[in-house]
Amino acid sequence: MTSIVEALVPGGKANPGPPLGPALGPLGVNIKEVVEKINEKTRDYNGMQVPVKVIVDDKKNVEIEVGTPPTASLIMKELGIQKGSGNAGSEVVGNISISQVAKIARMKKEDVLSYDLKATMKEVMGTCVPMGVTVEGVEARDSQKALDQGKFDDLLAGEEW
């Protein structure tokens, strides 16, 4: 029987404690070795929470799948902030450029249901709203409308999805 352990771990800094250790212990695998592999695969996401899936088969073979961090974490890393606004309607904690939004959208390509870059960018902008982050100096919802109206089409020209 194959067992699957899913967890959100700090990029490059997973440890044998919770949530991994208690979940992997009963499966009889070398926890230290698994944690080292996870840290190796997630080191590029240092400072962010990263979803990982550890798949252990009957013969104790381990496969590790690493997802991309949540969109909010990517936005915070891009802006260099620790957290979003506690009062999103009236407090702005940062401003993100349309090229940064596109960069995050490309990172999330494998994890979203959108069919193109423009739709994924709208999802990223939607995450900016409750965080108190503006896009190109205006509220994220207004930037979504501008994207729909073609204001940023020059940035998207020739983009393969």
From Swiss-Prot:
Q: Which SMART domains match?
A: RL11
Biological process annotations from GO: translation
Q: Which SUPFAM superfamilies match?
A: Ribosomal L11/L12e N-terminal domain, Ribosomal protein L11, C-terminal domain
Write down any Gene Ontology CC term: large ribosomal subunit
GO terms, molecular function:
large ribosomal subunit rRNA binding; structural constituent of ribosome
- What keywords does the record list, in alphabetical order? Ribonucleoprotein, Ribosomal protein, RNA-binding, rRNA-binding
Keyword Cytoplasm assigned to the entry: answer is no
Keyword match Translocase: no
Family of the protein in this entry: Belongs to the universal ribosomal protein uL11 family.
What the protein does comes down to: Forms part of the ribosomal stalk which helps the ribosome interact with GTP-bound translation factors.
Subunit relationships:
Part of the ribosomal stalk of the 50S ribosomal subunit. Interacts with L10 and the large rRNA to form the base of the stalk. L10 forms an elongated spine to which L12 dimers bind in a sequential fashion forming a multimeric L10(L12)X complex.
Supply the name of the protein.
Large ribosomal subunit protein uL11
Q: Which organism is it from?
A: Methanosarcina barkeri (strain Fusaro / DSM 804)
Lineage start: Archaea, Methanobacteriati, Methanobacteriota, Stenosarchaea group, Methanomicrobia
